[in-house]
Amino acid sequence: MNLHFYSTLRFTVALAAGLLFGFGLALSEMINPIRVLSFLNVASGHWNPSLLFVLGSALAVAFPGMALQRRLKRPLLDECFHLPSKKVIDRRIVFGSAIFGTGWGLTGLCPGPAIASLSTGLGSVLLFVAAMAAGMIIHDRIVVRSLS
């Protein structure tokens, strides 16, 4: 297969997947922090379980996709599958998950929906994404460098 065609096809598939993902985030209202917070607020008596459909849809695609992946030697548009090699739940994972969950619970935003929410042009979303990026940079400069 021609290398240019292969690169163009990979780019096109990534673009289509990103467009589909972003459209789905907006359509399901995952980019609406109030909707997300009402989903996370189970104990309030005003819990909105509608985002369970988002989770259910993700699982309905992921399970067959993972079963197919186990049968394939390599993906169609890459040299290998990029799967996590770390399988241990350690203090970093637990602590990072707690920080992530705290931020998600306080703001109703997590990375994918926050980036998709940039389309709204809201200052609070711009500030959130800038702070999120700063947090990732700080992590890379402090934590990753201290481990190497």
UniProtKB/Swiss-Prot annotation:
Cellular compartments annotated: Cell inner membrane
Induction: Repressed by BigR.
Main location: membrane
Gene Ontology CC annotations of this record: plasma membrane
Key word Protease present: no
Membrane topology: Multi-pass membrane protein
InterPro entries on file: DUF6691
Domain of life of the organism encoding this protein: Bacteria
Membrane-crossing segments per the record: 11-31, 48-68, 93-113, 118-138
Family: Belongs to the TsuA/YedE (TC 9.B.102) family.
Entry protein name: Probable transporter PD_1893
Source organism (scientific name): Xylella fastidiosa (strain Temecula1 / ATCC 700964)
